[in-house]
């Protein structure tokens, strides 16, 4: 029986994916085998020694200490794409709303309460909110992952000309992307072409301030920018300067800050991107399935700190080893399995940066003594026998 601790409210649709005969779900345990989390801050949390996995029901993992988890042999999962439709729909909605000045117009309409000549006031006042149609306009999409590719495809369907930039596009994303999306190999070449720019990349040291003073100079005058990925991807002082000069005519974002609120041309939504019951259910289901498969079978899918390793069982016991990505590890591991007289039925080894994972199915005397010897290899962090 594995114990799963839930932090935050996890959708019951996801929890239902955990077999009650194998998993005990609790909010009170101090010694969980796995943790399901949404937004709770774990950065300063001391983890129990037997904690094996943390699954984040969402894409971002900046609330989880990844380096420390790797050092302790804790696999961290996220759920990329589970909330993609929710975010993409909001982006398209805000693209249209921002173009047609809907938020400001709707707010102004509320001020007409009690106006005896409302019809005349409407006809007179609507002129200040005239906006543009998006059909025939050019959209630049930075990042063509699960969300960016959906936004690009939707924009194509709405009659926009779409350019996409993503030097790291996955095979799956490429297959799902409309052939009508123009591929740009250089961001600086794409920016001058776009009436609208939407950004869909993770927040990393290398992506911080993707939109900055220099990139803004390359943009069309009057460009509109949408940021429903992470606030830090856009340099706020540079953006505000560009709004003041008219280089940027509109900024739609899901990340309000004191500096942005009340500024002309800025539309802030309160982090609504994934705030739908459907997205919460999808994230919870994916997180539950990931943590379940890892605890039961050692398979790793959508981990942010360990490589993806998924293999069907080949019989016998399964040995799962988290270790540092160093030369000679395979030979040290197989030397011990040979010494134990094991027959390896299946074996896979993959690495991710400085971490690696070796999983093998073997018949013979797979026991605690072997696990102890494997654990004694200096670069080995954790050994599990399933």
How would you label these PLM feature ranges?
Residues 43-45, 167-260, 275:
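Rossmann-like adenosine-cofactor binding region
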Residues 148-149:
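N-terminal Rossmann-fold NAD(P) dinucleotide-binding loop
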Residues 88-107, 153-160, 286-299, 334-338, ...:
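Oxidoreductase and adenylate-handling cofactor-binding alpha/beta cores
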Residues 144-145:
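Glycine-rich Rossmann-fold phosphate-binding loop(s) that bind the pyrophosphate
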């Amino acid at each position: 029986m594995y114990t799963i601790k839930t932090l935050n409210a996890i959708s019951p649709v996801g929890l239902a994916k955990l077999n009650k005969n194998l998993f005990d779900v609790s909010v009170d345990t101090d010694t969980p085998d796995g943790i399901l989390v949404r937004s709770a801050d774990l950065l300063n949390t001391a983890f129990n020694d037997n904690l094996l996995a943390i699954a984040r029901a969402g894409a971002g993992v900046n609330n989880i200490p990844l380096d420390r988890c790797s050092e302790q042999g804790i696999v961290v999962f996220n759920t990329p794409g589970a909330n993609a439709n929710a975010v993409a729909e909001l982006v398209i909605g805000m693209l249209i709303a921002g173009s047609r000045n809907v938020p400001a117009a709707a707010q102004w309409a509320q001020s007409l309460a009690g106006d005896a000549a409302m019809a005349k006031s409407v006809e007179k006042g609507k002129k200040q909110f005239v906006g543009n149609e998006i059909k025939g306009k050019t959209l630049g999409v930075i990042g063509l992952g699960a969300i960016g590719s959906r936004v690009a495809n939707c924009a194509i369907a709405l009659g926009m000309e779409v350019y996409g930039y993503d030097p790291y596009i996955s095979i799956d994303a490429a297959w799902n992307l409309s052939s009508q999306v123009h591929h740009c190999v250089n961001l600086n070449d794409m920016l001058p072409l776009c009436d609208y720019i939407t950004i869909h990349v993770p927040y990393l040291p290398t992506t911080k301030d993707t939109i900055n003073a220099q990139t803004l100079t390359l943009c069309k005058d009057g460009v509109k920018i949408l940021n429903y990925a992470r606030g830090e991807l856009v340099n706020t002082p540079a953006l505000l300067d560009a709004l003041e000069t008219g280089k940027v005519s509109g900024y739609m974002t899901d990340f309000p800050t004191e500096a942005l609120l009340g500024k002309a041309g800025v539309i802030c939504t309160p982090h609504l991107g994934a705030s739908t019951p459907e997205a919460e259910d999808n994230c919870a289901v994916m997180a539950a399935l990931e943590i379940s498969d890892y605890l039961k079978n050692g398979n790793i899918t959508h981990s942010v700190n360990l490589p993806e390793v998924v293999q069907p069982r080949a019989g016998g016991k399964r040995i799962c080893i988290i270790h540092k990505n160093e030369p000679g590890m395979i030979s040290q591991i197989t030397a011990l399995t040979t010494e134990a007289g094991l027959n390896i039925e299946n074996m896979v080894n993959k690495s991710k940066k400085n971490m690696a994972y070796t999983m093998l199915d073997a018949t013979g005397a797979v026991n605690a003594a072997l696990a102890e010897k494997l654990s004694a290899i200096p670069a080995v962090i954790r050994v599990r026998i399933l």
